[in-house]
Amino acid sequence: NQIWLAENLKYKCSGSYSYKDNKSNDENYGRLYTYYALAKACPKGWHVPSDAEWKELAYYAKEHKDSNGTGTSLKANHSCWECDNNTPLGTNQFGFSAWAAGYKDSLTFYFDQGYGAYFWSTTEDSDDSDRACVWSLKYDKEALFSNFESKFCATSVRCIKD
């Protein structure tokens, strides 16, 4: 019963970045946002998902996926993902269409375009208030992962309908 945006946000605001400062990346990959930009990122009627909402998506995808892994079913079937003979291409089974937009670390370095998709949740780390939960897909993995990252990192954002 969730409705997700089917592309990464492209809204330019304070705390958002173009991958490697190249604005031509924004059209397909969207912008990368720090945790502190999340409050103003989503359009009216939408919000950045919590960890619980990401878990609900992951559970649904796991229960309804085809023979591929959960992560593979959420990845775009597109050349934005690096592949080799051992890596399944995304199937976009659920229309989530995750692009491998990469991320910006808490300093000034950019990583993983073509290799990973990273998405904020609003859930903070209960042990470290400077960190929050990020969900990720990797080019060579069929799963959907979560871990805590610095709030100064910049990742893609997907919004979910209120």
Identify the role of each PLM range.
Residues 2-162:
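Conserved positions within compact, well-structured domain cores
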